[in-house]
């Protein structure tokens, strides 16, 4: 494969010879051989981890390592049962985490398969349609308007070809292509005799010789650069890391102190003292925490996938929930990405498109010119062509005019294709009133070529300005009678003015409500677009992004600003127009330096660096390139801004539910710690066996914690402000609640322990403490549903998963206490009916006390 530098400089004949190809393309056998040699024509996903590696990474968590060490030491000291239970639980967690990670990757892969491109390729002299991944070096590919370009290559044939290369170069306008050889080294955007993978054809037809595929294309080179970029941690990852470090240090200190007191002050056996310390560690470490968080996040991703948002990484769910700034593209995300005619101007009047009367000759003639002087087609299989031209065709269809019928009746006899220099397009047709040239183009250019008087031109310029201020794109139409069909550029003069047609890409119906929901939630929506400022401002005002007190600026304004100046400037701006990829990165970084979490949307290759810079990169699933999707944390399957807002709502609810689950686990474990410490300081027997605490933490705790993670989502979260960037899970109010609730449950457990000691000795007391702690924690699940009391309210019953978890946990406890073969395994003693009644009363009483405390706290806030 030749280097990309030489390709645009060589003649087509040289390239055919070097690549051993012909204008008739490759044979099927040769194509198969080359595909084997070069590999499939697709971007490699750098760093994709194997299932085994993902599984092994589940054991790298610090809390898991502590548990593994505890299991090993337990085995050394002869406590094989505890070791087996601990290792079984750790393995279950690892399997669960692996499955969820693989499922998330599979969801994205399915999206890629849905949007996989195809190509028309010349094989054995015949044009066949193949999956894009099967195209190889030396193939000849056929292009038409609307086609996605599947590989890099040199043009062989070219008829008025224009390609949208904004995804690769950032150039907002389609690039005109030609066949001329190019001398010297030129930048990517000036290689007019080449086409590039990831771009698409907006106009014309062509054939090209494939010179590079897959990772050897220009897009592939950018994708390779992105592989090594370090990913940011989301707030949840940071919070859990902080939590893990603090908890681990605390556990080690407490266990060491307890071991020292037991051995050196109380003279206990070293092995017994160690087992006691291990029991405390087991009580303190929420073994199910990582799996609970993973499960809740995975449920969040599945819910969001059903709502058109595919999460590439589980933690991005929570990250979206704490976003405070959303930088969104305009076209296709806030708008419909579908140009629509809004107004016409004929006879000196501006007429709404839905109020036109095409029985009037001047309006009918304007519409006919719009249909005939256009290359777009609209049919059952979709729309092909420039968006402005498809809008003209749809206008005709809405009034019963069929473009195919019109073009069949008045065929095109000659044409002057549009180009960006003259900003005009002309076609020749035999119309009822004679041979006619129809011309459309920019208003200012057209006016200079018409027969209008200065006064008439001034009036049309006034109407054009009025329409432009409304964010409309305006085209002018004219005609000229001919004596012969052959035309040249000099004929585009002395035109009879027919009128103006104004169109726009209208906002999505749901955009305004979504923007309003963002603002109510304390999230700042920002529009960043390559479009003109007037157009962007009109859309932004209509949907509520551009409000009094904020402004719209063009990228050139921030070009000369330092990073410090831009950081102070960004709060004033709601719309950025005509921006470059570098501008996007600077805008995102400026908001981040102000302490904000930023979500950024993008679809092109040139958006990928900004998507990486953002805290949450959001790629478009329909129009987005594979490089953009790979750089993003979330992919929208409907390219809709409202989906981002819904994802934010889901993210906030998921975070709130995770916090409930963590509060449930930590307060329950706190109760276990306090009970063990009390027994140690009071010189009492060990209240729990390690297997008791593992049973509680992993069986009767896991289900309620998962159920709390599935609490019904609330719209109320969108009335709250985003959490500060630096706020972790372990806030002072959160820790106070955990400590208070843990103390209440511990008191109930200690009372049960003393009742057991008085009734039947250490074995009965241990069983009483175990059963009371277990049942109290099951009841405690209802306490964690809300910061307000829920007892005797509908909210107590609205989570069927929590009700089911309570029932299952209670049945498991009953089974352990009543099934004789389980008694030695779980180290429990037989209890009388009276003692069982004490357990139920103390456990339910702990819930009532906590509910009363919540009521008092709620009244205090009022």
List the predicted regions and their residue ranges.
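Membrane-water interface at loop-to-transmembrane-helix junctions
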Residues: 724-743, 763-767
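Helix-coil boundary and interhelical linker segments in multi-pass alpha-helical membrane proteins
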Residues: 680-689, 753-765
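Generic alpha-helical transmembrane segments
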Residues: 700, 745, 767-781
């Amino acid at each position: 494969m030749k280097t990309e530098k030489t390709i645009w400089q060589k003649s087509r004949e040289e390239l055919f010879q070097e690549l051993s190809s012909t204008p008739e393309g490759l044979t099927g056998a040769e194509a198969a051989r080359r595909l084997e040699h070069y590999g499939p024509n697709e971007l490699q996903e750098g760093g994709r981890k194997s299932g085994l590696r993902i599984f092994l990474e589940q054991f790298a968590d610090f809390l898991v390592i502590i548990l593994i060490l505890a299991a090993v030491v337990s085995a050394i000291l002869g406590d094989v049962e505890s070791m087996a239970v601990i290792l079984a639980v750790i393995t279950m967690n690892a399997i669960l985490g692996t499955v969820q990670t693989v499922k998330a990757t599979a969801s994205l892969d399915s999206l890629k398969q849905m949007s996989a491109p195809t190509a028309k390729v010349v094989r054995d002299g015949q044009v066949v349609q193949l999956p894009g991944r099967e195209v190889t070096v030396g193939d000849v590919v056929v292009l038409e308007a609307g086609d996605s370009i599947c590989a890099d290559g040199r043009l062989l044939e070219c008829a008025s070809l224009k390609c949208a290369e904004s995804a690769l170069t950032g150039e907002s306008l389609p690039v005109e292509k030609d066949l001329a050889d190019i001398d010297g080294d030129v930048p990517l955007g000036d290689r007019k005799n080449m086409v590039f993978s990831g771009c698409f054809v907006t106009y014309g037809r062509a054939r090209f010789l494939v010179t590079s595929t897959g990772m050897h294309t220009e897009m592939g080179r950018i994708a390779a650069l992105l592989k090594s970029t370090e990913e940011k941690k989301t707030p949840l990852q940071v919070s859990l890391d902080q939590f893990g470090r603090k908890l681990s240090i605390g556990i080690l200190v407490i266990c060491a102190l307890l071991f020292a007191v037991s051995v050196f002050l109380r003279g206990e056996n070293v092995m017994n003292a160690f087992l006691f310390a291990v029991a405390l560690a087991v009580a303190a470490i929420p073994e199910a925490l990582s799996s609970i968080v993973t499960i809740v996040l995975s449920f969040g991703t599945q819910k969001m996938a059903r709502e058109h948002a595919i999460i590439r990484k589980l933690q991005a769910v929570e990250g979206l929930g704490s976003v405070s700034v959303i930088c969104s593209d305009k076209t296709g995300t806030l708008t419909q990405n579908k140009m629509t005619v809004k107004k016409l101007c004929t006879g000196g009047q501006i007429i709404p498109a839905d109020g036109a009367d095409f029985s009037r000759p001047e309006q009918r003639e304007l519409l006919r010119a719009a249909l005939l002087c256009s290359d777009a087609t609209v049919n059952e299989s979709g729309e092909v062509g420039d968006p402005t031209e498809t809008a003209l065709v749809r206008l005709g269809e809405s009034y019963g005019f069929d473009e195919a019928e019109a073009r069949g009746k008045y065929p095109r006899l000659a044409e002057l294709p549009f180009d960006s220099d003259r900003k005009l397009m002309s076609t020749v047709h035999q119309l009822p009133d004679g041979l006619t040239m129809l011309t459309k183009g920019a208003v200012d250019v057209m006016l200079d070529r018409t027969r209008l008087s200065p006064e008439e031109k001034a009036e049309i310029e006034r109407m054009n300005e009025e329409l432009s201020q409304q964010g409309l794109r305006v085209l002018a139409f004219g005609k000229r009678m001919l004596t012969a069909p052959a035309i040249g550029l000099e004929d585009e003069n002395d035109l009879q003015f027919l009128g103006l047609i104004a169109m726009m890409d209208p906002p999505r119906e749901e955009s305004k409500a979504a923007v309003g929901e963002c603002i109510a939630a304390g999230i700042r929506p920002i529009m960043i677009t390559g479009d003109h400022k007037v157009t962007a401002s009109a859309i932004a005002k209509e949907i509520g992004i551009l409000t009094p007190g904020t402004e719209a600026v063009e990228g050139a304004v921030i070009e000369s600003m330092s990073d410090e100046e831009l950081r102070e400037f960004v709060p004033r701006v709601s719309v950025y127009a005509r921006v470059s990829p570098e501008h996007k990165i600077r805008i995102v970084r400026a908001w981040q330096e102000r302490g904000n979490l930023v979500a950024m949307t993008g679809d092109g290759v040139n958006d990928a660096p900004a998507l990486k810079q953002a805290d949450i990169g959001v790629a478009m699933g329909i129009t987005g390139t594979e490089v953009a999707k790979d750089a993003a944390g979330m992919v929208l399957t409907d390219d809709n801004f409202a989906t981002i807002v819904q994802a934010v709502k889901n993210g906030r609810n998921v975070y709130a539910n995770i916090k409930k689950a963590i509060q449930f686990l930590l307060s329950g474990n706190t109760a276990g710690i306090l009970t063990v410490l009390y027994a140690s300081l009071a010189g009492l027997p060990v209240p729990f066996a390690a297997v008791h605490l593992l049973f509680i933490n992993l069986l009767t705790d896991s289900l309620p914690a998962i159920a709390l993670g599935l609490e019904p989502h609330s719209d109320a979260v969108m009335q709250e402000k985003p959490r500060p960037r630096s706020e972790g899970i372990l806030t002072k109010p959160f820790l106070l609640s955990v400590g208070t609730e843990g103390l209440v449950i511990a008191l109930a457990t200690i009372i049960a322990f003393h009742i057991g000691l008085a009734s039947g000795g250490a074995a009965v007391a241990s069983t009483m403490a175990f059963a009371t702690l277990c049942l109290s924690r099951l009841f405690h699940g209802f306490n964690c549903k809300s910061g307000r009391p829920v007892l005797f309210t509908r909210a107590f019953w609205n989570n069927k998963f929590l009700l089911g978890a309570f029932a299952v946990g209670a049945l498991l406890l009953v089974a352990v206490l009543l099934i004789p073969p389980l008694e030695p395994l779980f180290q429990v003693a037989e209890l009388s009916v009276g003692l069982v009644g004490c357990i139920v009363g103390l456990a339910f009483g702990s819930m009532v006390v906590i509910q009363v405390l919540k009521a008092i706290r709620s009244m205090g806030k009022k």
